[in-house]
Amino acid sequence: MTVGVLVDKLPAGRPVYGVTSLAGELYVLRQKEADQVEVYDVISCRLLRQLTVPNACGYSDMTSCEHHRCLYISDPTIKCVHRLDVGGGTCTQWAVDDVPSGLSVNSANNVLVTCTLVRKIKEFSTDGDALCQVTLPDDVINPLHAIQTVSGGFLVCHGDDCDPLQRVCLVSADGRHTLRCHGGKPGSDTNQYKVARHLAIDANQYVFVADLNNWRVALLSSTLGYIRHVLTSEQFEWGPDRLCLDANRRRLYVAENRWDDGGWIAGRVLVFTI
C-alpha cells in the first residue's frame, strides 16, 4: 500500500465522535442535542440528511452493521448503546452497566463494546442481549477500542495520555493472554504511540491505527509488525481520533478533532485513498 492521498474534506463543525459507512452512505456523529448523525453520499461527499438520536446524553463512538442495516452509538453518560435503524429511523437503547467507549461489529453481526475503566469487552446481540464478556490482561491499561479477528482473538488499542504503555495488542479469545504487541512506552519513534486511539482492519487482517497525539496513522501486518505510516502529521491539522475503512472503495475516513482549553472544540472528517 502507498501513502494515503487526501481526496476530500467534510465541513468542520462540532467535534466528531464517530464515523462509519453503510450501503453507499457515510455517517458522521457529532455532539449536538439533535441531528447528531450527518449522512453523506460516499461518492460526492454531499450532505444528504441528518438523523436524531433521541434520549442521547453523550457520545464516545459509532459503528454500523450491514446485515442489520443499523448504527450503534455508545453513550458514556448514561452507560448505554443506542441502536438506530437507518431505514426507518427507529431508535432503541440498552444498558451496558459500565462506561462504554469503542464499538465494533464482529463476524456474527454482534456488537463489541470496549469498557475502558473496567478493562472489559462486552458482546451484545443487535437487540441488546448480553452474550458474553471478556476481562483483558492487567497490563492492557485503559483499552479504548477492540476488534475481533477471524481467529476469535481481539485486537485492542490501549493507553491514555499518562499511561506507561501505549500499544496495539492481540489478546486471546478468553482475554487471559496478550499474544502480540506493537508499541510500548509512549513516544514518537516508528514503533511508538502517543495514544493509540482507534483501529480499522481490512480483509487481509492488516491493521490501521490512529496515533492521536503524533498526528499520524500506522499500518501494521496481521502479526502486528510495523509496515509504514500511511498518513503522516503533515496531512493533519488536528489529531486523528476515529477511523473507518471502506476497503471496496479503497477509502480511509479519518475524523480529526481539535483540542483546546481542556476539551474538544471542533472536528471534521478527512477522506483519503489508500
Positions of PLM-derived features:
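Short loop/turn segments that connect beta-strands within beta-propeller blades
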Residues: 41-45, 85-89, 124-129, 172-174, ...
